[in-house]
Each structure stands twice: as C-alpha cells, then as structure tokens.
C-alpha cells in the first residue's frame, strides 16, 4: 500500500518536470520576439502573432503535463 502511494507521488512529480520545459520554451519564444523586433521594428506586426502561437503551443504542453500529474495523483 505504501509502495503504491510512493510510486504515485514519484510519478506525479516526474510529470511536473514538463512544466519547467514549458517555462523555458515560453521564455525562448519571447526572447526571439524581442530579438527580432529590436533588429527590425517594422516586422513587429508579422512576428507578434507567430510569437503568440508559439506561446500557446508551449503553454499547452505544460498544461498537459500538469493535467497528467493531477490524474496520477487523484484518479489512479
């Protein structure tokens, strides 16, 4: 019983490691946006929607990891 509970906690903590990857991905998206805008300010209107799309995809991956962590903790 306690081994299964420990395995559940370890699995949930391993699933949350993806949140760190999502945070790094979001940071890299906006670093690229700032870098591109500083090099060529006239491209801001083109770069911003692509940056928001990249942000949304990176955030979705992080939310999937968080959802899996909650599922491991409370549903299994």
UniProtKB/Swiss-Prot annotation:
PROSITE patterns: ATPASE_C. Belongs to the ATPase C chain family. The keyword Signal does not apply. It is found in: Mitochondrion membrane. Coiled coil: none annotated. GO terms for cellular component: mitochondrial membrane; proton-transporting ATP synthase complex; proton-transporting two-sector ATPase complex, proton-transporting domain. The record marks 59 as: Reversibly protonated during proton transport. GO terms for molecular function: lipid binding; proton transmembrane transporter activity. GO terms for biological process: proton motive force-driven ATP synthesis. Keywords: CF(0), Hydrogen ion transport, Ion transport, Lipid-binding, Membrane, Mitochondrion, Transmembrane, Transmembrane helix, Transport. It comes from Debaryomyces hansenii (strain ATCC 36239 / CBS 767 / BCRC 21394 / JCM 1990 / NBRC 0083 / IGC 2968). It is a multi-pass membrane protein. InterPro entries: ATP_synth_F0_csu (IPR000454), ATP_synth_F0_csu_DDCD_BS (IPR020537), ATP_synth_F0_csu_sf (IPR038662), ATPase_proteolipid_c-like_dom (IPR002379), F/V-ATP_Csub_sf (IPR035921). This is ATP synthase subunit 9, mitochondrial. The gene is ATP9. F-type ATPases have 2 components, CF(1) - the catalytic core - and CF(0) - the membrane proton channel. CF(1) has five subunits: alpha(3), beta(3), gamma(1), delta(1), epsilon(1). CF(0) has three main subunits: a, b and c. It comes from the Eukaryota. Mitochondrial membrane ATP synthase (F(1)F(0) ATP synthase or Complex V) produces ATP from ADP in the presence of a proton gradient across the membrane which is generated by electron transport complexes of the respiratory chain. F-type ATPases consist of two structural domains, F(1) - containing the extramembraneous catalytic core and F(0) - containing the membrane proton channel, linked together by a central stalk and a peripheral stalk. During catalysis, ATP synthesis in the catalytic domain of F(1) is coupled via a rotary mechanism of the central stalk subunits to proton translocation. The chain crosses the membrane at residues 14-34, 52-72.
């Amino acid at each position: 019983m306690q081994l299964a509970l420990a395995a559940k906690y370890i699995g949930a903590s391993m699933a949350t490691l993806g949140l760190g990857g999502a945070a790094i991905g979001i940071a890299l998206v906006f670093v690229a946006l700032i870098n591109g805008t500083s090099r060529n300010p006239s491209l801001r209107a083109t770069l911003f929607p692509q940056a928001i799309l990249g942000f949304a995809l990176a955030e979705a991956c992080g939310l999937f990891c968080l959802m899996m962590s909650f599922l491991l903790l409370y549903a299994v």
